[in-house]
Amino acid sequence: MTVLPKTLLLLGSGELGKEITIAAQRLGCHVIACDRYSGAPAMQVADQAEVLDMNNSEALTAIIRHHQPDVVIPEIEALAVNALAELENEGITVIPTARATAVTMNRDRIRDLASEELALLTPKFAYAGSAEELRHAAEPLGWPVVVKPVMSSSGKGQSVVSNPEGLRQAWQAAMAGSRGNSPRVIVEEFLHFDLEITLLTIRQEDGSTLFCEPIGHEQIGGDYQCSWQPAELSTEQLKQAQSMALSITENLGGVGLFGVEFFLCGNEVIFSELSPRPHDTGLVTLISQNLSEFELHLRAVLKLPIPTIQTADAAASRVILAKDNLSSISYKGVEKALSEIDTQILLFGKPNARPRRRMGVALAKGKSLEAVRSKADRAAASIQVIKGKGVT
């Protein structure tokens, strides 16, 4: 039996962490939000905040031991995972598990697990630890290729390379965009896919697994731009995706929501990546489902029932991006963005802006995917990120 409230310590306080915090507080929980800088989005609504380098094992261990939370919920990839493993051995609950956090923070570890251990279909790939190794690794894959740091987020350091001459620049971009200390990249074949999807997969305490309706999405440079739900898959494609998601999440273990990404190429479903936490493409569930991905994550984490997941006929999201470097920000055009029925705007509360930084998201629902995608696009286009304070 679950007794509330619980104390939750959140590692990472971005826009996804903010929604986790809000969902947790609606269940009466006490939330401690951690990040590398003060005033991060989740800190603005949390009960307590801590600023620290979460890659520093000693600092991370000290904070967790000081607060003694019931649950530690990672919201980002760049963490001192060895410290989490030690704390888990001491009895601290890490969501979904310390091992899952460690495996998924590096593209090489999750790709090896999927491709070699679980025999899931993935793009053809290789690894390289230098620009010279990258040249040798890329040639057999054919052109173009995609080069990514083994550790990064939101598309940082990713390049599509059309010929050997572009590989050195791709290596430099990958190293500049890499997180952590691994001077290594994954290079993979460029897939001419029909669709990218995220399958939100929820593991519960009793061992059962639930799936949300698949979410289609588009990226630029590996960074999410828009998403829609439900994505149109054949019965066989959905069956394949659910089977693969079940296989890999069962291997990782623990409880909570996982964002499992796939490419659809003809009749093939190809595994791409996995996040052991709510996914940015899943922001659409804030308007599309009776229980958002954040509420589903918390229910699984807190061992609460999920009787049913209801989905709207059609829903979509479109990110709101900054264009300039701004030390203080305001938003213009909110009234126009909210003038259409079944439209919502989320402004994340980030303290500053830079070109192409994700500052918010527009959400829309309705009866057809074409209509709601257009509606979300219009709402997002109405918002301007400008210098100043407040909302006008």
From Swiss-Prot:
GO MF term list: ATP binding; magnesium ion binding; phosphoribosylglycinamide formyltransferase 2 activity; phosphoribosylglycinamide formyltransferase activity
GO cellular component: cytosol
Entry EC no(s): 6.3.1.21
UniProt pathway annotation: Purine metabolism; IMP biosynthesis via de novo pathway; N(2)-formyl-N(1)-(5-phospho-D-ribosyl)glycinamide from N(1)-(5-phospho-D-ribosyl)glycinamide (formate route): step 1/1
Binding site for N(1)-(5-phospho-beta-D-ribosyl)glycinamide: 15-16, 75, 280, 350, 357-358
The keyword Ligase belongs to this UniProt entry's keyword annotation: yes
Function comment: Involved in the de novo purine biosynthesis. Catalyzes the transfer of formate to 5-phospho-ribosyl-glycinamide (GAR), producing 5-phospho-ribosyl-N-formylglycinamide (FGAR). Formate is provided by PurU via hydrolysis of 10-formyl-tetrahydrofolate.
Stated name of the protein: Formate-dependent phosphoribosylglycinamide formyltransferase
